[in-house]
Amino acid sequence: MSSAAPRTPTLLILDGSFGEGCVALLHLDGAAAGRFESAPELRPHQPLVARAAALLPDASSRSQIVAVLVGVGPGSYTGLRAAASLAAGVAAALNIPVIQVPSDRALLLARDASGQTDPVVLPLGVREVLVVDAAGSRIAERSGAPAGADLERIAPHLPAALASTAAEAIDLLRVHEWRTESGREASEIAIRYPAPPRGAEGGVAR
């Protein structure tokens, strides 16, 4: 009888701050920066959960996951909530920690990696956009928003940018051999809204 394949520590990366969102795996299999695997978008507007299921089709693949890395905004209200909900569910089911990453910082890194310099402009609704640049994140009217970087060129670089932003937390977990008290952190995901959702109180993300 052959022995089981050795476990490869893997992070599930989620972000819903813009567009179709980001679903990827980071396999920490000895390579200096790890090996990324992105979920294909099998059809337009496919939910994050379906794309995650495509990356993790069976118990064996899910058993490799040692933590969930989730972008917590600011960005699309609906997308951020979807990513946070999925991250919390996976972490609770597998009893693993959640690493929370500011989406705007990662978006700027991904923009730079794509060779662009324009601000990142994310649609928030019919009239508003979120402008992300070196000065921070702010709400602007669509009609007065600056020209934005090409989001399609940014998207392929986002998994690596999210992981880079979380490098210190990832290294700390690695030192402790991916062991934490539990996955209870999943219930404490704090979404950074750029402005209060309609009908709610809150502030501008800094």
Residue spans of the language-model regions?
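Alpha-helical transmembrane segments of multi-pass membrane proteins
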Residues: 67-68, 106
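Phosphate/pyrophosphate-binding loops at sites that engage ATP/ADP/AMP, CoA/4′-phosphopantetheine
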Residues: 52-67
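N-terminal, well-ordered alpha-helical segments
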Residues: 46, 50-53, 84, 88
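Phosphate-handling active-site elements
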Residues: 59-63, 91-102
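DPxDG-like acidic metal-binding loop motif
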Residues: 68-97
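Phosphate/pyrophosphate-binding betaalpha-module
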Residues: 37
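Short, well-ordered alpha-helices that flank and scaffold nucleotide-derived cofactor binding pockets
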Residues: 54, 88, 92, 113, ...
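Oxyanion-binding and handling regions
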Residues: 1-32, 41-50, 99-206
